[in-house]
């Protein structure tokens, strides 16, 4: 009996040791799922892969980052919602997708940016920190860094667009965001909000007549395979943000937070340079693939949008914010 009791005691003690040992190990590390809608070949996805690996290595596994590209964790809207409740820990996404803070979308408003240089100046200013505080309050989401996604241009399946009149009644896929819908309506088009991951098939099956995205995204999404024309409208420079759930952030040590910020922003610089390089080289690549490239009357597109969209969305953005960002570029 004594031997049986002794044996059971040893087994129970061992099980307790394993339980507490496992708990201590779990408590000392955090696993982060970093989501991305774009294909693995896109510079933004590659940025996340590089940064995730480096964060894991430099924190010695205290922060383990797993990167999921190509919308594996869901569509944009689904991932933003998952971020709010902590079901997903990190996300790189366009600012307009964070609809719990409508004013944030102004960072990709049509024709608000003069050029990539003034964009870079503003996103490194106090304006971003103001948005960061508001996003933490409204969505429990923190901004770790802001990326340059590139100029957005229009593509069409079979319609050569040289002027504003050529896009009248054209069914254009836009993100599921009010601002994009308002822009396409100002052009006289028929905006068709659609999940990004459904876009290639929709273009192939002529569900929509066209779409708009930056050149690197047109490339990684292979939209040039199902689009005949590329129209260089340059209507939006999109800001995408690298974000983390605030509750998770507060569980990370100060030392590891510094590592994460350093790694993320270092890789953002690499990413931004890659995007700019691709913007310079991809047009000729698309032409080689059989795409006809058109430079339209850009002022027509710009003027009709600026006459209506900022005023229409001022209640969402906040009075005077559009003008403030214009002035910050001086």
Q: For the regions a protein language model found, what residue spans apply to each?
A:
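Short, low-complexity disordered leader/linker segments with a strong preference
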Residues: 1-31, 330
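N-terminal secretory/targeting leader peptides
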Residues: 22-118, 127, 136-330
């Amino acid at each position: 009996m004594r031997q049986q009791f002794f044996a059971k005691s040893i087994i129970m003690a061992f099980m307790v040791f394993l339980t507490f040992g496992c708990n201590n190990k779990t408590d000392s590390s955090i696993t982060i799922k970093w989501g991305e809608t774009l294909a693995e070949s896109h510079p933004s996805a590659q940025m996340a892969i590089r940064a995730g690996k480096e964060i894991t290595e430099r924190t010695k596994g205290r922060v383990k980052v797993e990167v999921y590209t190509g919308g594996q964790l869901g569509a944009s809207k689904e991932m933003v919602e998952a971020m709010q409740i902590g079901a997903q820990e990190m996300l790189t996404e366009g600012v307009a997708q964070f609809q719990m803070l409508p004013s944030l979308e102004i960072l990709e408003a049509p024709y608000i940016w003069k050029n990539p240089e003034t964009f870079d100046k503003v996103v490194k200013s106090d304006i971003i920190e103001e948005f960061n505080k508001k996003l933490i309050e409204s969505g429990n989401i923190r901004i770790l860094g802001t990326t340059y996604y590139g100029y957005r241009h229009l593509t069409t399946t079979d319609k050569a667009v040289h002027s504003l009149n050529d896009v009248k009644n054209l069914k254009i896929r836009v993100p599921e965001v009010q601002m994009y819908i308002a822009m396409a309506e100002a052009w006289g088009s028929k905006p068709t909000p659609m999940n990004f991951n459904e876009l290639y098939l929709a273009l192939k099956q002529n569900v929509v007549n066209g779409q708009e995205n930056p050149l690197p995204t047109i490339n990684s999404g292979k939209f040039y395979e199902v689009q005949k024309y590329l129209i260089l409208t340059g209507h939006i420079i999109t800001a995408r943000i690298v974000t983390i759930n605030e509750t998770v952030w507060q569980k990370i040590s100060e030392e590891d937070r510094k590592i994460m910020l350093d790694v993320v922003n270092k890789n953002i610089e690499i990413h931004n340079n890659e995007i700019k390089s691709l913007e310079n080289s991809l047009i000729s690549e698309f032409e080689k693939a059989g795409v006809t490239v058109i430079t339209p009357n850009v002022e027509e597109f710009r003027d009709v949008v600026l006459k209506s969209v900022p005023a229409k969305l001022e209640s969402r953005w906040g009075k005077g914010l559009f003008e403030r960002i214009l002035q910050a570029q001086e």
